[in-house]
C-alpha cells in the first residue's frame, strides 16, 4: 500500500504544476470514483448518500460525500488543505531583452526560497484567457518541456556567493527563455498562441490575459539509501491534498464527509476562492435547510486542517524546541500555538491522538521555539470564518517552500490511514 500511495503522489505532483492543474487532477479522480460536479450558478438537488464536488476559480475544490444521517444529527467531518505553493509568476508585460537574451519578468508568489530556483530546468504552466471566434474562453496550458533557466553567476565573478549573498528578485530571478538574433523582437503572447494551438487545437484571435507560473521539470522521486524519503516540488501542500483525497475515496462508514482544497493560502487566503473567503460556508449552507440549520450542524462538526510541518533538520536542530521536534517518518504532527497561529485546542488534539492510537499510527507534537515567530495555516482562518472546531496537523517536511522539498516515504500512508479513520468516525467530541 505504501509504495502505491507514494507513486500516486508522484503522479499527482507531475500532473499538478499549478493550483489550476491540481484542481483539475483532483476533479478527474473524483469523477472516476462516481462524484458528480455541481455548478454554483445552478440550483442543487443533492440526495442522501450522494457524491458531489464543486470548484471555484478552477483553483479551489470542495468534495462532498453525504452520509445516511443528517448533518443536523452527526455534523460534518472536514479535511482542509491548499492547492497553491510558492513560485515565480509571469508578469503581464514580461519581455526583457538584455545582451541578446530573452528573459521573462516574474513576480514572487508566496514566501519562496530563492536560491534553489537557480540552475534548474524550468517549464511554464497555468491558465490563459483568450478570444477565439469572438468568444471569450480560458484553457489550462503546460509547456511540459524545459524552456527556461535562471543561471547562477560564476563564483569567480561573485566571491561572496557563499557568504549569505542576498538575491534581488527584480534583477536576478527573471528566467532566460531564448537567445535573440540581432534585431529580433519578442512577443510572449505569440508563444501562448502557439501553445494553445499545440495543446488544445485552438487558434486564438488574441490572448487577453494569463496566470502562468514557472516550475521545476524534475519529477518527484522516492530517495534515500533505503527509500526513506520523497523529494519533490509542491509537497507543501499537495501532499495533504492527495492524502485527503485518498482517505475520502477509501474511507469506510457512512458519515457526512467534506474535503476542502483552497487556493491562495501562501498569500493569506483572502480571496473569493481562499479559506478566508466565503467558499466553504456558501457550499455547506446549500447542503442544509434554511434557518439555524447551519449553526447547529457546524457545532457538531470538526475540521482537520492538514498542512506540512517543519521536521527537525539534523544540521539545524537548534531551530526547534528540544521537546517538540517532529521526525520524518514519525507520523502526523499536531501543531499547537497558544497565540492561535494554529487552531488546535486540548479537545481537538486529544481526539486526533485518540484516532491515531486506535489506528496504530504514530503521532507527534510541534510547538515553535518561544523566541521565534510561528507560521499559520488555513486552520485558524476557517475556524474563525465558519465557527468549526479545528485541529491543525501535518506531515514533517524539510526545505519547506523550496523548489524541491523532502518528506518521509512512510508518512503519507500514516496520514491517509488516520484521515480515513476520521472520516469513518461515528462520534466526534
Swiss-Prot record:
Enzyme class, UniProt record, top EC level: hydrolase
A single GO cellular-component term on record: cytoplasm
Single Gene Ontology MF annotation: metallopeptidase activity
The UniProt record lists the keyword Lipoprotein: no
Annotated EC: 3.4.11.-
Binding locations of Zn(2+): 82, 156, 401
UniProt keywords, alphabetically: Aminopeptidase, Hydrolase, Metal-binding, Metalloprotease, Protease, Zinc
Domain of life: Bacteria
Keyword Metal-binding assigned: yes
InterPro entries noted in UniProt: M18_aminopeptidase_2, Peptidase_M18, Peptidase_M18_dom2
CDD domains reported for this sequence: M18
Cofactor needs: Zn(2+)
Gene Ontology terms: biological process: proteolysis
Homology family: Belongs to the peptidase M18 family.
Protein name: Probable M18 family aminopeptidase 2
Organism listed in the record: Pseudomonas aeruginosa (strain ATCC 15692 / DSM 22644 / CIP 104116 / JCM 14847 / LMG 12228 / 1C / PRS 101 / PAO1)
Lineage summary: Bacteria, Pseudomonadati, Pseudomonadota, Gammaproteobacteria, Pseudomonadales
Gene name per UniProt: apeB
